[in-house]
C-alpha cells in the first residue's frame, strides 16, 4: 500500500469524490481540509463524524468540545458546539455544500469561479481560506498538502461534478 493510500484511506477519498459529484467542491481541497482539520483522521470527534470541525447552528445535531481559535493575534482555547453527522460521507457532503453555497460571501463566490471556470484549485483555496479558517497560514497548509500528496489526481474530470 502506498504512503498516500495510508494517509488518505479509500473511504475518505470516495467521500471526497462523492462530495465533488454532489456539490462541485474539488475533492483535492476537501481531502486537504480533512487532513488539516482532523490530523489525517486522528481527530474526527469520534461518533460525531465531523472531521472538518464544522460548527453547529442552533437546532443542528451537535457535540460540544474544546478547540483552538485564532483571534486577536493569538491562539485561544474555547468550547464550541460542532455538528454531528451519521457518517464521514455525510460530513463530506455537508462540507462541499457549505463551500459551494456562497451565502453571499464574496470569498466563496470567487473560490467557485476559480474552480468552475478554470479548474484552479490554488485559486479556490486562496479565495476560500480566509473566510473558512481563523489560522492565517491555512491556505499555505492546504496548498502544501494538495501539492505534496498530488491530491489533484482525485478531482473528478470536468463535467463529472
Regions found by a protein language model. Give the residues of each.
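Catalytic cores of secreted/periplasmic lytic hydrolases that degrade extracellular macromolecules
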Residues: 1-161
